[in-house]
A protein has these predicted regions:
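Cell-wall polysaccharide-cleaving catalytic domain and substrate-binding groove, primarily
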Residues: 1-241
């Protein structure tokens, strides 16, 4: 069970990873993407007529916030099932408009709620992964998860990576048949002892899977531009919180 202080540190690290810990970064539409990324966890929200290969998470967060009794969700969000902006240009043109300003205020005032949502996703991830993993993978994944989780920065790594690149169970999240989620990172770790050694190997395995993703990606997506940032993020997993 994570302490309140550990949760606070993890939430702030995720926010730092995704948008430099800035309030402005809580509503972002990245170059080359077809959707905005919202909140400390850069939760994806798809426009109405777009369905990408990545798991959409912003609507799930809003449902979670409602279940937790959040009273300050902007009314327009509750009435809008799909992202109302259809392009990065229209999104950025409205960056300081009433809707995005109210959304940033809500997100900035509910950092702990977003952290709890990310934690809940992470805690549910292992069970989902074991269901879809091959019988040969299951024990390796279970053991590696326990080894990594035995340190506070390892626990942060497991939580952050699920939020960052997903569980690895969505068959659409593949390039040339190869995934890059938590399943693939855990399954491809090299044999290592529990503790900091496991956290360091998780970091290294994550970088290897992300390098493979870049290698297998459509060159027109230009994913190589993300390599340095992705590696920097994975490097934080090997360092104490």
């Amino acid at each position: 069970m994570l302490s309140a202080e550990s949760k606070r540190k993890i939430g702030n690290k995720i926010w730092q990873n995704e948008s430099g810990g800035t309030i402005n970064g809580l509503t972002t539409w990245n170059v080359g993407e077809e959707f905005p990324s919202l909140g400390i966890g850069h939760f994806i929200w798809y426009p109405k007529n777009f369905r990408g290969p990545y798991t959409e998470s912003f609507p799930s967060f809003i449902r979670y916030a409602q279940q937790r009794g959040a009273k300050d969700i902007p009314a327009w969000v509750l009435k809008t099932p799909h992202c109302p902006w259809t392009s990065r240009v229209s999104f950025n043109a409205d960056k300081n408009g009433a809707r995005l300003t109210s959304l940033r205020n809500f997100l900035a005032n509910n950092i702990e709620l977003q952290t709890d949502f990310i934690l809940a996703k992470s805690q549910a991830a292992l069970g989902k992964i074991l269901v879809v993993a091959t019988p040969a993978q299951r024990e390796t994944i279970r053991q590696n998860y326990a080894k990594v989780a035995s340190t506070s920065n390892g626990a942060y790594a497991l939580i952050d990576y699920v939020n960052f690149k997903g569980e690895g169970i969505n068959p659409k999240e593949r390039y040339k048949g190869e995934g890059w989620g938590l399943l693939q990172v855990l399954a491809n770790m090299r044999p290592v002892a529990s503790g900091q050694a496991a956290a360091s190997e998780f970091s290294a395995s994550a970088k290897r899977r992300l390098d493979l993703r870049i290698k297998n990606s459509d060159p027109t997506r230009g994913e190589n531009r993300w390599r340095e940032g992705w590696h920097n993020r994975c490097d934080t997993y090997a360092r104490p919180l």
